[in-house]
Amino acid sequence: MRLTQGCFSFLPDLTDTQIEKQVAYAMNKGWAMNVEWTDDPHPRNNYWELWGLPLFDIKDPATVMFELNEARKSCASGYIRINAFDASYGVESCVMSFITNRPATEPGFYLDRTEGPGRQVIYSIKSYSVQANPEGSRY
């Protein structure tokens, strides 16, 4: 099951040339960039691990592409995404985020039902990869 988070998630994977064009677009808007990675694909997992430092005031897309390629070398079997932040309104907020790297296989999710008090049924979504393997060895 393909993880669909962020921009372009329903499209085929972006090539490096397309990623570089999106990074250039964000830089032309004056947005700060960063690279993040995770091996926990849960839809509500918004807190991915930051790769390196945030890239403020970067003028060349090659810098972001270098960081992306370094993250790919180290975290090749997980998810990697690029975020762009707009601080022009005085509040830093993410305005663009897209996945640039995925595991070879994405096992998907299952629905877990738990009986609560009375007739209450509690539903939760869990990842097959998280259930089967500990953190750091999921893909």
Curated annotation (Swiss-Prot):
One of its GO terms (cellular component) is chloroplast. SUPFAM superfamilies: RuBisCO, small subunit. One of its GO terms (biological process) is reductive pentose-phosphate cycle. SMART domains: RuBisCO_small (SM00961). GO terms for molecular function: ribulose-bisphosphate carboxylase activity. It is found in: Plastid, Chloroplast. Keywords: Calvin cycle, Carbon dioxide fixation, Chloroplast, Photorespiration, Photosynthesis, Plastid. Heterohexadecamer of 8 large and 8 small subunits. Belongs to the RuBisCO small chain family. In this alga, in contrast to plants, the small subunit is encoded in the chloroplast. RuBisCO catalyzes two reactions: the carboxylation of D-ribulose 1,5-bisphosphate, the primary event in carbon dioxide fixation, as well as the oxidative fragmentation of the pentose substrate in the photorespiration process. Both reactions occur simultaneously and in competition at the same active site. Although the small subunit is not catalytic it is essential for maximal activity. This is Ribulose bisphosphate carboxylase small subunit. The lineage of its organism: Eukaryota, Sar, Stramenopiles, Ochrophyta, Bacillariophyta.
